[in-house]
């Protein structure tokens, strides 16, 4: 190794920092194999030196027990090595190609390690080993009273590491520690690994550099009346006498149930502890704390030595001095951290009293560190829960000696082994766990673009063809064995016999039924609740919705209220960005009743969609619900139910189906599964809507084609979703009472031009949507209709012209103004409509993400016709 220069000044520390930085730069290029070889060699060397290092520490500091320090050194070498020997800390440490995620470990750089006088060699071993495992350089600032042993431990690790291939200057230390050099080191390092008292920890956190610091412990041990007294007392003795109580997690007080207090005292005495009488307790009080601070002369000393200092005579082999005290506030010297075999003993009148005492002891002197409970873990689980809920400590140990238990991997093998125990924000720390290698690594996450898992959801059964309704209903008896059917429809359909084909078939099969026919357009919550009263009394095992969108929406809501009367519509109507990641989980449907939808108009597609809209009649608020639990279990598309639809309904619902298809095709969430349905529906609507509108029941073929087109469009948008045509249409209809099909048809032209912009203000956000291509998608629709055109823009305009021709042919007017909406009324609602349209659930899947001002502009163009 190169000639060593004593670090005793700012100048020499500056040089050392530079050398360690250069060494770390080289070390950061090492492979995992090289690092693991160095890590093992260093751990072996530290383990082999455990006895001489322990002797040196006790000799130098005059504190602790050699044999226990041997165990600590052994632990720091063996347990730390065992914990991390197979951990990846170099380069790629995790990779999942299916999710496109790769995690890469990088060292943080230079670690400033502040070492306490209480555990000098073991802490130095621990910190140098985890620094080597993570390819960091480390510079140690030892405590002045333990510098010789601390440096020897670091030197032992360094020599073994270099021999195994590590850079020569990867570990260094301050030979002549001072406050000035320690502060300089902390300010110059990349991270501070601090172990010590509150003052040192505060200094570390004030350095301006990231710090991993711990602080004082004041561990209370509560002994519940259900505890195994022999186990509890001997565990506490084992912990408190370990290295003469210098582990920061060691018990500082015991709080004992009054029901077993004498028994616990007897066990302590039996095992060699000394219960101080009141006079002796007072003498020891004055020895523990001097001038408001812990007396350094008692730290790590034997109980007999401390008793002598206090002028108390005890047997030489006394293990612990126990003072019976009552106060838990700071005026009581025994209530402080003592770092010696001196213990406070409190009597508790109840478990809650014990909790309060323990809480106060932690609050005043050991926030965040460790607390301990002895209890019957089988019968007193509630007490354990109360204890960990009350204690503000990051380690809550149960039936465990806290010194050995707190450092981890000895009494619980999932608690990380460490000699630096985080105290969380309660203790003013940045970590709340046992510090380990992960805290000395920067983890880069490489995230490759991945596309969402998509889906195609539809009712489990969809039946179609004219006259299929009674045939499909036979399944209720022959397949499902249903007994009671509740029918939901509107007054017009009921009075005009639309439900008769269903009720006749149910009567034929001997199935009991009841009909609710008070559904109005834009169904209300009151309407749904009225229906649910009947449903609750009737208790159906099947619900059949017959009608257009309103009847099916109302029936879906009744279905929800019947199966889950506890639901909150505000929660169910909550907006989502991804239906699979929504905050609100929709309740499971279909457990009480099977749901069948029978459409009587060709437009909404509700028979195959997971959507419903309900209005709160008291506020006028519409609640749009969307969840695949609302998907009907069966859809029966029988064109015979649509033959006599009036022209206005045929027109509005037909254009609604067209908009469903177009929006589903250009949606960011469109897939090959929805594209085919959308295109087929578009072609069918252009061909057959005029015939259905003009000929009605005289052209049953056109009626059937439109029925199928509406359902295909429904399947398409049930999976690809919609866009701002529907966002704007919903609000226009709500504010100005126009039919839904009319409103979406009115805004369609301007929305298409808006979406087709190749340089949008903002494009939509979805991984499958790689770049703005709505124009291309509109052109593909035009191509499917053989509209011609040489460019995509030309094809778009031809498609819009074709749509306008269709709308005119089926009786549509051209502008909002043409429908009798006054300019004053329209403009007075414009801002509110625009904002609410922006917040509509349909906006999220639109290929162009709109600004509210852009929605407003589209509304204005649609009102006046063209440019504004």
Language model features with spans:
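ATP/NTP phosphate-donor binding region
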Residues: 454-542, 816-817
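Conserved C-terminal structural/oligomerization subdomain of aldehyde/semialdehyde dehydrogenase
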Residues: 312-313, 317-452
